[in-house]
């Protein structure tokens, strides 16, 4: 039976970077668990800001967080008050010097994670799942994506038996490593239970320029 590999993990080192970039010789497990908790808590705390991803770097005894968000103003706050408050809280918790970089997501309509969270939010507000899926797909295509697939799973419309439905428009070359495919997952907590939302967004191919070796000069010699 065929299974689908995670599109992000499949392309790590090819056209996708690691989201935790550090190495230590001891206490690796503790720092890894700390990374997971930090990412989870920041996503929950900054839910209104539309956080797409949180990347972690640990240069020396410092902690650097790179937050990609659709609404950076909510995180920064007036005159930087909110981000300073967040930084102080993290420094107190981790006992490290913390640096926070905020990167704006220019087109949230093409970000798979934000699309999944938006659909989940609509499902929690009792919007029909087909309508929510179609609206997200139409919006992504309008902003220039080459292909998009949305899949929802669970007790759709409150049915007794859980099922999955999906909607696909355009191309989605999952086996092509150079394809820039973004993947997102979110959960909608409804009165009937949890509905899972998965999105795949194909934004085109990434071609890496090959390094050209200098060629020897070609000439003619007359003896």
UniProtKB/Swiss-Prot annotation:
Q: Which UniProt keywords apply?
A: Ribonucleoprotein, Ribosomal protein, RNA-binding, rRNA-binding
GO CC field: cytosolic small ribosomal subunit
Molecular functions per Gene Ontology: mRNA binding; rRNA binding; structural constituent of ribosome
Q: Does the keyword Ribonucleoprotein apply?
A: yes
A GO term (biological process) for this protein? translation
Segments forming domain KH type-2: 38-106
- InterPro entries in the record: KH_dom (IPR004087), KH_dom-like_a/b (IPR015946), KH_dom_type_2 (IPR004044), KH_sf_prok-type (IPR009019), Ribosomal_S3_C_sf (IPR036419), Ribosomal_uS3_bac-typ (IPR005704), Ribosomal_uS3_C (IPR001351), Ribosomal_uS3_CS (IPR018280)
Signal peptide as annotated in the record:
none
Purpose of the protein:
Binds the lower part of the 30S subunit head. Binds mRNA in the 70S ribosome, positioning it for translation.
Family indicated by similarity: Belongs to the universal ribosomal protein uS3 family.
Q: How does it assemble?
A: Part of the 30S ribosomal subunit. Forms a tight complex with proteins S10 and S14.
Specify the protein name: Small ribosomal subunit protein uS3
Q: Give the organism the record lists.
A: Acidobacterium capsulatum (strain ATCC 51196 / DSM 11244 / BCRC 80197 / JCM 7670 / NBRC 15755 / NCIMB 13165 / 161)
Q: What is the lineage of its organism?
A: Bacteria, Pseudomonadati, Acidobacteriota, Terriglobia, Terriglobales
Gene this chain is encoded by: rpsC
């Amino acid at each position: 039976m065929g299974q689908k590999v995670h599109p992000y993990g499949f392309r790590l080192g090819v056209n996708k970077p690691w989201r935790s970039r550090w190495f230590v010789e001891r206490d690796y497990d503790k720092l890894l668990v700390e990374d997971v908790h930090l990412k989870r808590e920041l996503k929950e705390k900054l839910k209104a800001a539309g956080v797409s991803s949180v990347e972690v770097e640990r240069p020396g005894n410092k902690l650097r967080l790179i937050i990609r968000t659709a609404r950076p103003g909510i995180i920064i706050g007036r005159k930087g008050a909110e981000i300073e408050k967040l930084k102080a809280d993290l420094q107190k918790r981790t006992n490290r010097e913390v640096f926070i970089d905020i990167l704006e997501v220019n087109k949230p309509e093409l970000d798979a994670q934000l699309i999944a969270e938006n659909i989940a939010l609509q499902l929690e507000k009792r919007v029909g799942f087909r309508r929510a899926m179609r609206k997200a797909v139409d919006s992504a295509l309008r902003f220039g994506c080459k292909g998009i697939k949305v899949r929802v799973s669970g007790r759709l419309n409150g049915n007794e038996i859980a099922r999955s439905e999906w909607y696909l428009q355009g191309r989605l070359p999952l086996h092509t490593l150079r394809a820039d495919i973004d993947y997102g997952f979110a959960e909608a907590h409804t009165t009937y239970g949890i509905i899972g939302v998965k999105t795949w967004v194909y934004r085109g191919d990434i071609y890496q320029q090959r390094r050209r070796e200098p060629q020897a000069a070609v000439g003619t010699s007359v003896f």
